[in-house]
């Protein structure tokens, strides 16, 4: 049944729209929503993208080591290490020269730094994708869009793309892998082939914010492309820790890039850009016992997520696009407005989703649904089925 809003829901929806407009192309946080629209009772956050099981794992360590271990005061009171010191901790763990690792206050800080400092006159950005790569472009940078095909489920047509890049001759290109908002994934061998064909491009930016949710075999083994940097020095690999590890609140990410680029960044204000809590997390991240536990919950989360997507695909009003991330791009097929659907789910069921009507490169009524815990995913599925019965 077509989604319809009553007068009360329309009034709340307008408040939601106003908050969204104030947030630009990003969704307002659940804290902002709750504060500004107290009528809402948000129960499940299916908008923001993180692994809830990894959050629980981190909280357990934080409680045992910092709170119960009486070390939290030190983390809060004393200055954290400088960028290069924390970078060495990560570099030693991933097997990269420390001179090629840069720590960011979230991946978004790294994206902005890269766009402002290294991207020149022209960059190619695939669409639909994460908006910051065109929003952060300098005024003198020509952003050229490469449209991913809806008929191909927004997967990259590699040969067509390579020809497009050759004809445009940019100084920079961006590949988000898996892509946001559709979760499209370029496997290791195909990515390596792309890099080998684009050696003439000055900067190849590879955003791997969701790579821990992708897999290439039935064992869900982790994928590691860091070593490609050793072969292709024009790459800039950006990693967000927020999604994989469910720690968006502490703002942490890192990048792999050439030494001269990092040297330039450190001369321009990134010397002390990590908090004590983010440093604690990164030092925890490189410990074998923690990482082994994380890898176990990562694999379990992937299985639950893919099961969730299969169940979503069984809803006749939906087209669910194949995803190798922890979110699914969903097209509404019954004529319902994506704005009305997202509003109804939030107001009536307390489930916060993301409408994609502000995404450049999408034509139609699209929403993005993040995977949560098994219990939360079941509640989302039940609520969706209920809303279409009204």
Curated annotation (Swiss-Prot):
Which keywords label this protein? Capsule biogenesis/degradation, Decarboxylase, Lyase, Pyridoxal phosphate
The record's catalysed reaction(s) read: O-phospho-L-serine + H(+) = phosphoethanolamine + CO2
Q: What is its EC number?
A: 4.1.1.-
Note the PROSITE patterns from the entry: AA_TRANSFER_CLASS_1
Which cofactor names does the annotation list? Answer: pyridoxal 5'-phosphate
Q: In which pathway does it act?
A: Capsule biogenesis; capsule polysaccharide biosynthesis
Provide the function of this protein: Pyridoxal phosphate (PLP)-dependent decarboxylase involved in the biosynthesis of amidated D-glucuronic acid structures found on the capsular polysaccharide (CPS) of C.jejuni. Catalyzes the decarboxylation of L-serine phosphate to ethanolamine phosphate. Less active with L-threonine phosphate. No activity with L-serine, L-threonine, L-aspartate or L-glutamate.
- Name assigned to this protein: L-serine phosphate decarboxylase Cj1436c
């Amino acid at each position: 049944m077509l989604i319809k809003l009553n007068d009360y829901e329309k009034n709340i929806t307008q408040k939601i729209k106003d908050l969204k407009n104030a947030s630009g192309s990003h969704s307002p946080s659940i804290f902002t929503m709750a504060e500004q629209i107290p009528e809402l009772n948000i129960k499940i956050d299916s908008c923001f993208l993180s692994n809830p099981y990894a959050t629980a794992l981190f909280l357990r360590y934080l409680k045992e080591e910092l709170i119960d271990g009486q070390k939290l005061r030190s983390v809060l009171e004393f200055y954290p290490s400088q960028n290069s010191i924390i970078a060495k901790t990560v570099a030693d763990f991933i097997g990269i020269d420390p001179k090629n690792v840069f720590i960011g206050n979230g991946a978004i800080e790294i994206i902005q730094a890269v766009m402002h400092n290294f991207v020149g006159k022209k960059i190619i950005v695939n669409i639909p994708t994460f908006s910051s790569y065109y929003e952060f472009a300098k005024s003198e940078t020509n952003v050229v869009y490469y449209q991913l095909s809806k008929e191909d489920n927004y997967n990259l047509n590699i040969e067509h793309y390579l020809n497009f890049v050759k004809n445009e001759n940019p100084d920079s290109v961006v590949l988000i892998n898996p892509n946001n908002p559709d979760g499209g994934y370029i496997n290791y061998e195909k990515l390596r082939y792309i890099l080998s064909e684009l050696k003439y491009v000055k900067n190849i930016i590879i955003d791997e914010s969701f790579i821990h949710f992708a897999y290439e075999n039935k064992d869900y083994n982790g994928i590691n492309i860091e070593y490609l940097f050793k072969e292709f020095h024009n790459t800039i690999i950006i990693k967000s820790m927020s999604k994989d590890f469910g720690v968006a609140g502490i703002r942490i990410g890192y990048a792999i890039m050439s030494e001269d680029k990092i040297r330039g960044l450190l001369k321009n204000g990134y010397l002390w850009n990590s908090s004590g809590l983010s440093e604690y997390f990164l030092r925890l991240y490189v410990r074998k016992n923690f990482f082994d536990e994380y890898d176990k919950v990562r694999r379990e989360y992937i299985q639950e997520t893919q099961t969730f997507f299969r169940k979503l695909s069984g809803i006749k009003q939906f087209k669910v696009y194949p995803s190798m991330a922890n979110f699914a791009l969903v097209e509404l097929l019954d004529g319902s407005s994506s704005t009305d659907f997202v509003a109804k789910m939030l107001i009536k069921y307390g489930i916060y989703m993301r409408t994609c009507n502000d995404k450049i490169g999408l034509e139609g009524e699209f929403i993005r649904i993040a995977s949560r815990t098994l219990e939360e995913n079941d509640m989302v599925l039940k609520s969706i089925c209920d809303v279409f019965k009204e």
